[in-house]
Amino acid sequence: MLDAFTKVVAQADTRGRFVSDSQIDALKQLVADGTKRLDVVNRITASSSSIVTDAARALFEDQPQLIAPGGNAYTNRRIAACMRDMDIILRYVTYAVFSGDASVLEDRCLNGLRETYSALGVPGGSVAVGIDKMKAAAIALANDPNGVTRGDCSALMSELASYFDKAAAAVG
């Protein structure tokens, strides 16, 4: 896992060069957006249970075969495992937002997930739909302007969306 600062230094060191002006500008923007970043992480964290529960509920309403007898999420134990996995993915998305870098999400959560799900017979497409539902809820929550730092958050929302997209692509 690398935060944005460590990653920039590692890249410059690998090339045997100083950190470039464009990299410094990008890091300045990351610092300038730090409070917004913390607001997003705090909002998602505070609402994580409802984000996961609502996304799972919507997924099972859209795909009732998953919870029907013989379905992949049939039985409370399997539903709980599905929701646990969704919660883990959401947690790692918040880590990525906090650090400004996707490597923690990719390295510690997504690598090998598709293969694991395939081996267990978990329908990756359904998991991807659940992730998309969490994405919609998290972005709506993060975009609410009440009680957060004012300013343009479009780049941060795009970044947040990209982490969910990476997760959905990794399982789908």
Swiss-Prot record:
Binding site for (2R,3E)-phycocyanobilin 1: 82
N4-methylasparagine carried by residues: 72
Matching CDD domains: PC_PEC_beta (cd14768)
Post-translational modification: Contains two covalently linked bilin chromophores.
Keyword Transport: yes
GO process annotations (BP): photosynthesis
Keywords carried by this UniProt record: Antenna complex, Bile pigment, Chromophore, Electron transport, Membrane, Methylation, Photosynthesis, Phycobilisome, Thylakoid, Transport
Main location per the UniProt record: membrane
Entry's family note: Belongs to the phycobiliprotein family.
NCBIfam families assigned: phycocy_beta
Functional summary from the UniProt entry: Light-harvesting photosynthetic bile pigment-protein from the phycobiliprotein complex (phycobilisome, PBS). Phycocyanin is the major phycobiliprotein in the PBS rod.
Protein name as it appears in the record: C-phycocyanin-2 beta subunit
Gene from which this protein is expressed: cpcB2
